[in-house]
Amino acid sequence: MSIIRTDAQADALEILKLIIQTADFYRAMGEQLSAENIQHSLFAIADERETFIESFQHVIKELGDLPSTPDADREWIEEIGGKLTQLFADNPKRAIENKCLEKDEILANLVNTNTLGEHSADIKRRLEALNVNLKRSKAILSGE
């Protein structure tokens, strides 16, 4: 393992971190909405998103790097921001869903603009599956 990461390694690591961050955020916001007795599908989306963690850990290892986790303090601050958004929103569920959509958009942009798929057909399939998951989550959250 080299000290300097290749672009592919950096992209794969960032995708893994965003997968974990979005799943954790969905779960935390789901708990917040559940505490308010608001119906939502955030836990189901988080569960499905978490299925990609092991897959992308494998991609990172395949590229010769070691997987890492997101910054816990940053995740905590983002969760506080989500809770504040929900607290001051006229429609708490919609506000939280919009926050989730914003986070997914960042992940979707990275999934659609990286060059990881050029390394192997297996990595390309994993990226396509994650992209399908992101589109499905967007459809659920935006009510399409």
What are these regions (language model features)?
Residues S2-L33, K93-E118:
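Alpha-helical bundle segments that constitute or directly flank the non-heme di-iron/ferroxidase center
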Residues D7-I15, S34-S55, K93-I96, A121-R136:
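Alpha-helical scaffold segments that form or flank carboxylate-/histidine-based iron centers
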Residues A8, E14, Q21, A28, ...:
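Long, non-catalytic architectural segments outside compact domain cores
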Residues I20-A23, R27, E50-Q57, A108, ...:
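Structural signal for well-ordered, non-membrane alpha-helices
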Residues S34, Q57-I60, G64, P92, ...:
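Long, hydrophobic, amphipathic alpha-helical segments used as structural scaffolds
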Residues H40-E75, S137-E144:
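Conserved alpha-helical segments that form or flank metal/cofactor-binding pockets of metalloenzymes
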Residues H58-N98, E102, I106:
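Carboxylate-rich helix-loop segments that flank metal/cofactor sites and access channels
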Residues I96, K103-E144:
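Preference for long, well-ordered alpha-helical segments
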